[in-house]
């Protein structure tokens, strides 16, 4: 397979000086939009308790933990500004993405302990399910950094369990484990109620010495009372016993390591929990990426920064998709699938970092004498016609057969 894809056909062409000059305003507008996105990412990162106060408590922020555990330069954040329920923080209370830990790829997610101690907040369930779906689809270990104070009670109706609610996340953990996909968790801080469920459902639980997980409330605590119910007198007795150290606080490390066995191991330092997660990830079976490379990695022949001079910010304006692709793929080479058939759609194979990848993209512009089944109008790029749909179906089927990943550059107004 390697020689077959070592050298492919060239794609793209240099930009003319006139086009670069004409698109200067577009470049400035695109850069302005990117700065707005970067500013929002930074705002979310700084939202909540200042990192300094978290550090004063002897704790790391979720950002600190991620920076410590991932291989340098490997973290690819996802869903950072995803906020489907317009939560006041502008996020879903978790930080997630793809990452390499101890040389092995995984899906990584952690509760943002700078905001309401990592509470379940509106929109978080959908984010969590997207993350677990990703682990399922890509067959990658799921690594949790758990520091969750449970549901944000004033908005608890927004996190009720349903098919896309928080309860489904725990079902997904069981589903992943049944599929042989490990779910690893580092446990920090106090994790009551839903935070406790989050803590007990992974495969391996590694806890910091100050960690606590408990699922409870008056109805649960009453089961510990000889009366069979929980009242003010029982509460006072429990408080007095706790003050005099006559009872081990439920959910503590002493309970879940010594008695229930939920915790696989307990560590003195926060970084030791992360080191232990690294150790488990190092033991994960995985192919070396070079096994799948069809050619040595190579830079595009044309500068990726020129894309802003090709793709207009105005969504109604057209552009040359082939020129965009040429600035993203190795050596600006491709192997087009069925060129000339279904011209409104590009389908082909390319290399990215030496790996083979399928590409589907919508081409723009007028298409004379097309579609072939009518003379009443001419085809317009960005729409989908019969030939293009047939070509996409064939291409996706063959990529699926050969397990070649596909990226779709979707820019279509429909059929």
Question: How would you label these PLM feature ranges?
Answer:
Residues 2, 7-20, 24-27, 146-289, ...:
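Conserved catalytic cores of soluble enzyme domains
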Residues 1-106, 110-117, 243-244, 252-262, ...:
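Intrinsically disordered, low-complexity segments enriched in small/flexible residues
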Residues 123-127, 164, 194, 200, ...:
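Charged, alpha-helix-enriched surfaces in structured cytosolic catalytic cores
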Residues 97-177, 184-186, 348-351, 355-415:
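Cleft-lining beta-strand/loop regions that shape enzyme active-site pockets
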Residues 50-53, 139, 195, 403:
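Alpha-helical hydrophobic/aromatic positions enriched in membrane-embedded helices and signal peptides
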